Amino acid sequence: MVDVPVALAGRQYVIHVGPGLLDQLGERVAALRPTSIVVVTDPTVAALYLERAVRSLQPVARTEHFVLPASEAAKDLAAAAKVVDALVAARADRRSLLVALGGGVVGDIAGFAAAIFMRGIRFVQVPTTLLAQVDSSVGGKTGVNHAAGKNLIGAFHQPGMVLADTSLLHSLPAREVSAGLAEVVKHGLLADADYFAQVEGLMPRLLECDDAALGPVVARSCAIKAGVVGRDERESGERALLNLGHTFGHAIEAMSGYGRWLHGEAVGCGLCLAADLSRRMDLIDSGDLQRIEHAVASARLPVRIPGFERGRAIEQMRGDKKSEGGRMRFIVLERIGRAAQRLVPDAVLDATLVAGGYV
């Protein structure tokens, strides 16, 4: 097991990474001394892991659960309200603990409900997908979607702990594994060229959920994100770099209808578009672009998702929260292993969209 600290101003929590951790959940949350526990999960995860989680937690405090019909299309205020209703029904108080057992959607909804219930109660993330383990469970971003865009309603609410049991990833469909690898590739691209090269070499083993390959990769991705979050918790500067590929990716998700493409699939395509943008701005060369596209393709992710109207895509991206005053600000690559924020000329963006198959 590897412990990755997340050091914030005046406080710290730990990401525990390793196989077999789910059965230690109760032992690890006991130090939080909750008056009661509510586990929020989805139907798929409930069938696989809920009984084990509850069995581990029951000796610690009265434990109840709520099964949320979680999907990206249903990640909205109504879903968060259902979790709040479940907390009320469970007679939760300000010393209660909410446990988010599931993928990124469950974590986002449950974390947001924890942030708003009684002005904030503690919660613990137990991510069950690769994407959630390496990215969405770390850093305290919680929220839900709005018709106008992804994650427009939310709050920063840090978990008390993250427990990333890598053995849970063996139950993932291949498509979900690939989706998580998009964030792994992203971390190497924006922060660590050596890690990016390591991921390139490990890709076949990662796709097979090889334990010896997965553990170090999950821990390294968590450490990269934890370092950025520790330096910029509220995204006033450096943390925005973690959005590499996401302005494009969020637009793809919104235009195609939430759920048509997994978040990681849209981000994988977004990474390629961001790399193309970087090449057109003479920040990276064509060899770097080809290498990035090959890494995304080798993760079995789409390099291009064509067919969208350019005007609609641009309008969608202008509404993204990484746009300021209507100006288009993107995270670009200065080289593999280093990202930066840049204002992008409209002509360059248009050329990238044309190259990506937009009409």
Predicted features, each with a name:
Residues M1-L97:
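ATP/NTP phosphate-donor binding region
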Residues V2, A182-V184, L283-V359:
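C-terminal charged capping/lid subdomain of soluble metabolic enzymes
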Residues A70-S71, L101-G103, L244-G245:
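Glycine-rich beta-strand-to-loop/alpha-helix junction loops that act as flexible
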Residues V105-F112, Q133-V134, H250-A251:
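Short glycine/serine/threonine-rich phosphate/pyrophosphate-binding segments
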Residues I109-G120, M255-S256, D276:
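Alpha-helix C-terminal capping segments
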Residues F112-R205:
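A glycine/threonine-rich phosphate-anchoring loop and its flanking beta-alpha core
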Residues A197-G311:
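Active-site segments that bind and position negatively charged phosphate/pyrophosphate groups
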